[in-house]
């Protein structure tokens, strides 16, 4: 789960991380009031959306008067902000965060992530802040420092020292950085986060460190322990189909292609998407119905896929282990009859009760295209939509 910048800063402040402060606005009629209340020399008006690249897209504006701030805020509120992470459709700005500006002497990058490949928590820091860390990693990898934290021992003094001195801090600033590392680590562990990113972390005119922007992502599986964090969820920032799927117990991610996929198992789902690309088309979604899906869940999965108007065909790829192929077949037929599937539908079944499943599909009198393996299925669905 993602949250907005202003919410991330609120959490970090509770753990002792110094951040820039401001006021959040959720209604246009509150804009002038917030700016008057802030009453500062420099205003920073920030669009609050769950996507990076806001600054380059015009979603962050620095102005030096109340009148300018009010105009910029009114112009920004409610627009569809398009960044390199939103896709061409953009994301509607329903929240603004208006801050007091400050002088920036130097920008840094600092984050903590759960590194799945290394099975540990990893700190990432760089003297090149305020830009995409991916660009830094590609062009100047020597500018990035990393420290892995053994989950058995947790954060140690050498981690804090290594990051502080690795970024070139000395004396009081090194002490501040070590405290920030400790605070961010504690926030990461105690909130069940998977990523906390501060970009940029700056030195201001008082020679103090300050988190100027912040992003936190949480592990959905840990949210039941944190009702206060769950309450921060902004459903307007999430794809309605993804929300609907989550409520139905389905793992669904919308993509940009036109072939809908329904698969059981994340690995098989990714392999299915790969082979669709290999045969010259693009998947419209990732959808894992899970190992224990019943007829109703299969039916709901197909309804969700067909709710995407870009879908021109559907590929169902099921390996029946825990899940029985006959149950899948019954769900497909029920969905087809209930909602009327008008796009080509290719079904590949393998595993438990596969022959029974194939028989059910064959006797349904529906226009279902059977496939005997994954390559055959991909080839048939790509040909069917051409």
Curated annotation (Swiss-Prot):
Keywords tagged on the record: ATP-binding, Ligase, Magnesium, Metal-binding, Nucleotide-binding, Tricarboxylic acid cycle
Reaction catalysis annotation: succinate + ATP + CoA = succinyl-CoA + ADP + phosphate; GTP + succinate + CoA = succinyl-CoA + GDP + phosphate
GO CC aspect terms: cytosol; succinate-CoA ligase complex
Keyword Ligase: yes
Domain ATP-grasp per the UniProt entry, residue ranges: 9-244
Residues annotated as binding ATP: 46, 53-55, 99, 102, 107
Enzyme Commission number(s) of this protein: 6.2.1.5
InterPro entries hit by this protein: ATP-grasp, ATP-grasp_succ-CoA_synth-type, ATP_grasp_subdomain_1, Succ-CoA_synthase_bsu_CS, SUCC_ACL_C, Succ_CoA_ligase-like_bsu, Succinyl-CoA_synth-like
Family matches, as Gene3D superfamilies: ATP-grasp fold, A domain (3.30.1490.20), ATP-grasp fold, B domain (3.30.470.20), Succinyl-CoA synthetase domains (3.40.50.261)
Obligatory cofactor(s): Mg(2+)
One GO-annotated biological process of the protein: succinyl-CoA metabolic process
GO molecular function, one term: ATP binding
Pfam families recorded: ATP-grasp_2, Ligase_CoA
Annotated transmembrane regions: none
Binding positions (Mg(2+)): 199, 213
Cofactor descriptive note: Binds 1 Mg(2+) ion per subunit.
Enzyme class: ligase
Chain positions recorded as substrate binding sites: 264, 321-323
Pathway(s) the chain acts in: Carbohydrate metabolism; tricarboxylic acid cycle; succinate from succinyl-CoA (ligase route): step 1/1
Superkingdom of origin organism: Bacteria
Quaternary state and interactors: Heterotetramer of two alpha and two beta subunits.
Family: Belongs to the succinate/malate CoA ligase beta subunit family.
Protein's job: Succinyl-CoA synthetase functions in the citric acid cycle (TCA), coupling the hydrolysis of succinyl-CoA to the synthesis of either ATP or GTP and thus represents the only step of substrate-level phosphorylation in the TCA. The beta subunit provides nucleotide specificity of the enzyme and binds the substrate succinate, while the binding sites for coenzyme A and phosphate are found in the alpha subunit.
PANTHER family assigned: SUCCINATE--COA LIGASE [GDP-FORMING] SUBUNIT BETA, MITOCHONDRIAL (PTHR11815:SF10), SUCCINYL-COA SYNTHETASE BETA CHAIN (PTHR11815)
Name of protein: Succinate--CoA ligase [ADP-forming] subunit beta
């Amino acid at each position: 789960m993602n949250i907005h910048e202003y919410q991330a800063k609120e959490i970090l402040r509770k753990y002792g991380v110094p951040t820039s402060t401001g006021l959040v606005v959720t209604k246009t009629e509150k804009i002038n009031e917030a700016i008057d209340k802030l009453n500062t020399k420099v205003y920073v008006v920030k669009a609050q959306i769950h996507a990076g690249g806001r600054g380059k897209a015009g979603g962050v504006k620095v102005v030096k008067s109340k009148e300018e701030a009010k105009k910029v805020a009114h112009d920004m509120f409610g627009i569809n902000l398009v960044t390199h992470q939103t896709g061409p459709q953009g994301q509607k700005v329903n929240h603004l965060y208006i801050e007091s500006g400050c002088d920036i002497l130097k920008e840094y990058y600092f984050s903590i992530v759960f590194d799945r490949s290394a099975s540990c928590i990893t700190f990432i820091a760089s003297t090149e802040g305020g830009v995409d860390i991916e660009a830094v990693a590609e062009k100047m990898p020597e500018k990035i420092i990393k420290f892995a934290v053994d989950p058995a021992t947790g954060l140690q003094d050498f981690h804090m020292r290594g990051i502080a001195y690795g970024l070139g801090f000395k004396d009081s600033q090194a002490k501040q950085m070590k405290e920030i590392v400790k605070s961010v680590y504690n926030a990461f562990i105690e909130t069940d986060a998977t990523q906390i990113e501060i970009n940029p972390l700056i030195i201001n005119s008082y020679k103090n460190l300050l988190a100027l922007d912040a992003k936190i992502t949480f592990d959905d599986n840990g949210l039941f322990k944190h009702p206060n964090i769950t309450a921060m969820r902004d459903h307007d920032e999430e794809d309605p189909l993804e929300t609907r799927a989550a409520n139905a117990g389905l793992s669904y991610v919308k993509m940009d292609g036109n072939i809908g996929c329904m698969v059981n198992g994340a690995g098989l789902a990714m392999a299915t998407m790969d082979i669709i690309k290999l045969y010259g088309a693009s998947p419209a979604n990732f959808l894992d119905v899970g190992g224990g899906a019943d007829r109703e869940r299969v039916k709901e999965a197909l309804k969700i896929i067909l709710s995407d108007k870009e879908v021109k065909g559907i590929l169902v790829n099921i390996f029946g282990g825990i899940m029985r192929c006959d149950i899948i077949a019954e769900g497909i037929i029920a969905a087809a009859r209930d909602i009327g599937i008008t796009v080509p539908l290719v079904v590949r079944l393998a595993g438990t009760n596969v022959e029974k499943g194939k028989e059910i599909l064959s006797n349904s009198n529906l226009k279902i295209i059977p496939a005997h393996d994954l390559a055959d299925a991909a080839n048939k669905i790509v040909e069917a939509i051409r």
